[in-house]
């Protein structure tokens, strides 16, 4: 199946195996974005700058590098971040009745990791003056010192994303951000990301794993698409359309079927093509049936 592997890889790039890592990230950088420079002066004193930078990349958790912790509005407990809360409070080890997730936009209080002062959500600690997150989103209540992620806030999605705003666009019909390479080529599916992955059932819109947009417009985790490939599954789990260019595979199947004698010359069946939607009446074959319109073997009897 080497040829199919190459085809799937090529299609994944063409159809936006863009990183749609949809976790909330930065709207504002106090230290670099002049548009939001309400808390800095024209000439920053070297001592003040040194204070802002104190402890950068030294605090945080497995999910974020940040210099604060959050108080969860739902259970009033303190966690390093929203994910840390959800991993603890939404675990299978917790009573199902008590499981819950933290509503990111409702966080009101943060605790400075350097001085321990609890305060309302803000970028600079009111007590010690340290910047608690080089990138800060007041809407998503997100703090992150790792600016290499190229965080940006999408008003359409209502959350922040990573990868650089210039590399993505928001599709109003699909209801999510896609790679700019898909702007004029993707198939729109209403609410394409607002559902669970058809393989692992994780909610795609808030998933921290990479998501791929299939030619049919449906979405799936990249890792799940790879697992499908490993098991020789090349049809969308939702609509059954081919997930990549299968023309070479169909040509090979033509050659193989030509060597197999057919003992049902007089039997005809009607088929529906999963790729183009056309119906055909073709000679019955034990192995596969070919669409008379698009020549695909991705068909079913009707």
UniProtKB/Swiss-Prot annotation:
Zn(2+) 6 binds at residues 171, 174, 186, 188. Disruption phenotype: Decreased relative stomata aperture under normal growth conditions. The keyword Nucleus applies. It is found in: Nucleus. Zn(2+) 5 binds at residues 154, 157, 170, 177. One of its GO terms (molecular function) is zinc ion binding. A zinc finger (CTCHY-type) spans 132-196. Zn(2+) 2 binds at residues 74-75, 85, 100. It catalyses: S-ubiquitinyl-[E2 ubiquitin-conjugating enzyme]-L-cysteine + [acceptor protein]-L-lysine = [E2 ubiquitin-conjugating enzyme]-L-cysteine + N(6)-ubiquitinyl-[acceptor protein]-L-lysine. It comes from the Eukaryota. One of its GO terms (cellular component) is nucleus. Its main location: nucleus. The gene is RZFP34. This is Probable E3 ubiquitin-protein ligase RZFP34. A zinc finger (RING-type) spans 197-240. Possesses transactivation activity in yeast cells. Involved in the regulation of stomatal aperture. May modulate the expression of genes that control stomata opening during heat shock or drought stress. Keywords: Metal-binding, Nucleus, Stress response, Transferase, Ubl conjugation pathway, Zinc, Zinc-finger. It is an enzyme of class 2 (transferase). Induction: Induced by salicylic acid (SA), ethylene and infection with the rice blast fungal pathogen Magnaporthe oryzae. Induced by abscisic acid (ABA) and heat shock in leaves. Pathway: Protein modification; protein ubiquitination. Zn(2+) 1 binds at residues 61, 63, 81, 84. A zinc finger (CHY-type) spans 54-130. One of its GO terms (biological process) is protein ubiquitination.
């Amino acid at each position: 199946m080497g040829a199919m592997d190459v085809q799937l890889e090529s299609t994944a790039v063409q159809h936006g195996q863009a990183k749609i890592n949809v976790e909330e990230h930065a709207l504002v950088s106090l230290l670099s974005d002049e548009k939001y420079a309400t808390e800095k002066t024209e000439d920053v004193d070297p001592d003040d700058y040194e204070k802002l930078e104190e402890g950068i990349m030294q605090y945080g958790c497995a999910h974020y590098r940040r210099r604060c912790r959050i108080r969860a509005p739902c259970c009033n407990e303190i966690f390093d971040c929203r994910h840390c809360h959800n991993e603890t409070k939404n675990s299978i080890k917790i009573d199902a009745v008590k499981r819950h997730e933290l509503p990111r936009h409702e966080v009101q209080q943060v605790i400075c990791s350097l001085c321990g002062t609890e305060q309302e959500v803000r970028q600079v600690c009111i007590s010690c003056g340290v910047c608690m997150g080089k990138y800060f989103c007041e809407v998503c209540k997100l703090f992150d010192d790792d600016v290499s992620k190229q965080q940006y806030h999408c008003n359409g999605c209502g959350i922040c994303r990573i990868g650089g705003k210039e590399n993505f666009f928001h599709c109003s019909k699909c209801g999510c951000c896609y790679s700019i390479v898909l702007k004029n080529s993707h198939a729109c599916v209403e609410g394409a990301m607002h559902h669970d992955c058809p393989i692992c059932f994780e909610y795609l819109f808030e998933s921290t794993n990479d998501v791929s947009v299939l030619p049919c417009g449906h979405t799936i985790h990249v890792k799940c698409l790879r697992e499908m490939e490993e098991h020789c599954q090349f049809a969308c789990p939702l609509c059954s359309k081919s997930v990549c260019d299968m023309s070479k595979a169909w040509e090979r199947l033509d050659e193989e079927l030509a060597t197999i004698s057919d003992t049902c010359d007089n039997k005809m069946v009607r088929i529906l093509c999963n790729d183009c939607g056309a119906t055909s009446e073709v000679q019955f074959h034990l192995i596969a049936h070919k669409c008379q319109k698009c020549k695909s073997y991705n068909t079913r009897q009707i």
